[in-house]
């Protein structure tokens, strides 16, 4: 039997970037041989084993044949006679279809290294169209590698359009959609994930709420880019520059969903979008099973980002009311995340990317002043029961007045 390092680990090694997961393929072995050498069987649908020492996954070389619809409709065949080339051809992209043996010898039967050097994401074979999940995977790899100059090959993009047109994307479970979206949020360019999905027609199928933003105008005075969809991509890019927090990056992408349902008669104004967006975010998060941590931050950003942009105009009591809604007294780190989203929204406008965002400083100063109010001093002053909270509110408002010179 021969063991090869395969897939992303080989790709990343050749690119000179860190790889955290090693995947191995074993040629010429049977399950019995693996078990005899101390490996532990873990695969349900096909034979995957954990190494006895490092616990890394080792899969027996296999072939796949389409037998039904969707990304699960495959029959797998594994046997000691399956070659490395036969195993690699079933993979999605040429850059993921390379292998390396323990001596460092590279095996590249499908031109992955050439595509790596030319910064091309290209399908290995026409069997690419048999798995609709690959559309999302290619979009994610585009986001992961965009900063290195990678683009999708024209022929591959056409196959992705064919998949989108076929209806096969509807077979993807909500969990798989979220899994790929979630992974894309940790890439250097999460916005590219969305733009590639849109280019092939998949965004309208898997994330129609975001697709609905494209072609919707905003006031040119505030948004030189005009198109809400383009603005959303710009905000997504800015959020990734400002924060590594995945909930922050998610909230930035969905904060303006309400603009997608503004009646055309009201364009380019979107006076109610902070309100109408809440329902859309809730439905989206429910549909694709988004964790509560992501949903809660997105809802707060959606509801209050326009108010935060007007920080200099707000009365101290209004600022305290907003801080209360954020529950910052118990979750102080939340305010920073919300303000980063608002800063990304502010910077995600054509030609205005480098403008300062003093609103964040105003809110942080107000919070620090209000948080300094000592509840023990209120109690010592003789306040009891509900009166303690009322007095605390008054003193917080007064502290903000002093801090902001209002």
Swiss-Prot record:
It holds the Pfam family HD. It catalyses: a tRNA precursor + 2 CTP + ATP = a tRNA with a 3' CCA end + 3 diphosphate; a tRNA with a 3' CCA end + 2 CTP + ATP = a tRNA with a 3' CCACCA end + 3 diphosphate. Mg(2+) binds at residues 21, 23. Keywords: ATP-binding, Hydrolase, Magnesium, Metal-binding, Multifunctional enzyme, Nickel, Nucleotide-binding, Nucleotidyltransferase, RNA repair, RNA-binding, Transferase, tRNA processing. ATP binds at residues 8, 11, 91, 137, 140. CTP binds at residues 8, 11, 91, 137, 140. GO terms for biological process: RNA repair; tRNA 3'-terminal CCA addition. Its cofactor is Mg(2+); Ni(2+). The keyword Repeat does not apply. Residues 228-329 form the HD domain. The keyword Protein biosynthesis does not apply. Its EC number is 2.7.7.72, 3.1.3.-, 3.1.4.-. One of its GO terms (molecular function) is ATP binding. Magnesium is required for nucleotidyltransferase activity. Monomer. Can also form homodimers and oligomers. A single active site specifically recognizes both ATP and CTP and is responsible for their addition. Belongs to the tRNA nucleotidyltransferase/poly(A) polymerase family. Bacterial CCA-adding enzyme type 1 subfamily. Comprises two domains: an N-terminal domain containing the nucleotidyltransferase activity and a C-terminal HD domain associated with both phosphodiesterase and phosphatase activities. HAMAP family: CCA_bact_type1, CCA_bact_type2. Catalyzes the addition and repair of the essential 3'-terminal CCA sequence in tRNAs without using a nucleic acid template. Adds these three nucleotides in the order of C, C, and A to the tRNA nucleotide-73, using CTP and ATP as substrates and producing inorganic pyrophosphate. tRNA 3'-terminal CCA addition is required both for tRNA processing and repair. Also involved in tRNA surveillance by mediating tandem CCA addition to generate a CCACCA at the 3' terminus of unstable tRNAs. While stable tRNAs receive only 3'-terminal CCA, unstable tRNAs are marked with CCACCA and rapidly degraded. This is Multifunctional CCA protein. It comes from Vibrio parahaemolyticus serotype O3:K6 (strain RIMD 2210633). The lineage of its organism: Bacteria, Pseudomonadati, Pseudomonadota, Gammaproteobacteria, Vibrionales. The gene is cca.
